[in-house]
Amino acid sequence: MNSARRVLIRLLILCSLLVAVGWLVHDDQGRPIVRAIVEDYSKQRGIRLVGERWPAIFEAAKQEDLDPSLVAGIMWSESRGVSGRVSSVGALGLMQLVLTAASDAAERLGLEAPDHDTLLHDDALNLALGCNHLAWLRDSTPEWNAEALLVAYNTGRGRLLEWSQEAGSYQLWVASQEVRHAAGRPMSPALIYARETLRVRNAFREQFAGD
């Protein structure tokens, strides 16, 4: 075995050990280091990609009297600003809309209902329909705060109304989720989504404070 090959094998072994250690060692959030590095890179890249779309986000949000930073936060949570994404449940594009919600939004805007490929690849239309859908959630349930709107955007208005009715109110449903979390049980993914989106919204507010 020549020296170059021995060096290569040693490097491969070292890399394998580093990856293994990366999965065994956890960060302060309890994530394996390897996973933390990948996730943090994806998040920061998403902030940059969504930020590059700020002019379009600002104009689309303005049409629906929405906070553009909130819309940017949703885009970050849904697609990380990457075009052409399809979720496991069939949600499409930058704002991750299902066809039924997109068709309803298009009807409210006086537009033709988009087909699958149009909704997936027409970023401007996807953004406009996503903003209209968010505005519809806001207007149809005015008592909801930003967190509740985001939960509904993620899981569906009907489902959140059902959860709130079962708990007695939205606030009581949130309280029940926090009790679960305190007891070491998983919190609703939709509530986690909403709270992370609000944190990202705040980051965009700081970044584009002058707009």
Label the model's feature ranges.
Residues 1-7:
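Short, Lys/Arg-rich N-terminal segment immediately upstream of the first membrane anchor
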Residues 9-25:
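Hydrophobic membrane-insertion alpha-helices, especially the h-region
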Residues 28-83, 106-109, 124-125, 200, ...:
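Export/targeting segments at the very N-terminus of extracytoplasmic proteins
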Residues 36, 149-211:
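Catalytic and substrate-binding regions of cell-wall glycan-acting enzymes that process beta-1,4-linked
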Residues 40-47, 57-61, 83-92, 112-124, ...:
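Second-shell loop/turn segments in exported
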Residues 69-72, 85, 114, 141-152, ...:
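Surface-exposed patches in mature extracellular/periplasmic domains of secreted proteins
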Residues 77-95, 101, 133, 156, ...:
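Cell-wall polysaccharide-cleaving catalytic domain and substrate-binding groove, primarily
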Residues 89-112, 129-132, 171-177:
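Substrate-binding/active-site groove segments that recognize
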